[in-house]
Regions:
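Short acidic/histidine-rich motifs immediately flanking catalytic phosphotransfer sites
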Residues: 4-11, 131-136
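Extracellular/periplasmic bilobed ligand-binding domains
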Residues: 29, 95-172
């Protein structure tokens, strides 16, 4: 990003994830007065970024997304939920909002646990989630970077058969 800014670019389109977006906005775009627009960075932390009017996004903040996911959980009559999230800005931010929102709906949160992306096997993570219990497991992450593995390990072990999935779990 520094390279294109030094070449006089008028604006930056990106980045695609919240952590990278926050770093580029804070360290490159805003200090250099360059407009930055992210189509997919959703972390609630970006809402309070001291952007001096230079940072925008076209996807809604997870501050709203977490509430919608909690409403969906309530509508599905889930009474207790285990939450696992990808261990990054997106996952942590959405998990925090979701946890508060489901609790506000009177839904018991049995556990909240981070998971690392890209592992070959998630059976130990699922065992930890299952030991806490829950009518369902909320998987806040990415389909191709751990989410699918958590679902598969849950089904294979019989730990969970109901899933609440975040927007990052959409894939082909």
């Amino acid at each position: 990003a520094e390279g294109v800014v030094s070449q006089g670019v008028a604006a930056i389109m990106g980045a695609d994830c919240s952590g990278v977006t926050g770093a580029i906005a804070t360290n490159v775009a805003v200090p250099n007065g360059v407009v930055m627009i992210s189509p997919s960075a959703t972390s609630p932390g970006l809402t309070t970024l001291d952007d001096k009017g230079f940072f925008f996004r076209t996807a809604p903040s997870d501050a709203r997304g977490g509430q919608i996911l909690a409403d969906f959980t309530k509508d599905r009559k889930v009474k207790s939920v285990a939450i696992t999230y990808t261990n990054n800005d997106y996952g942590k931010g959405l998990a925090d909002v979701y946890e508060a929102a489901v609790k506000a709906h009177g839904i018991k949160v049995t556990t909240v646990a981070a998971h690392e992306d890209g592992k070959a096997d998630y059976s130990s993570e699922v065992a930890t989630l299952a030991s806490a219990g829950g009518d369902a497991v909320a998987v806040i992450g990415y389909l191709d970077q751990g989410g699918k593995g958590i679902i598969q390990a849950s089904l294979d072990s019989g730990a969970f058969d109901r899933f609440i999935l975040s927007d990052g779990m959409i894939g082909q």
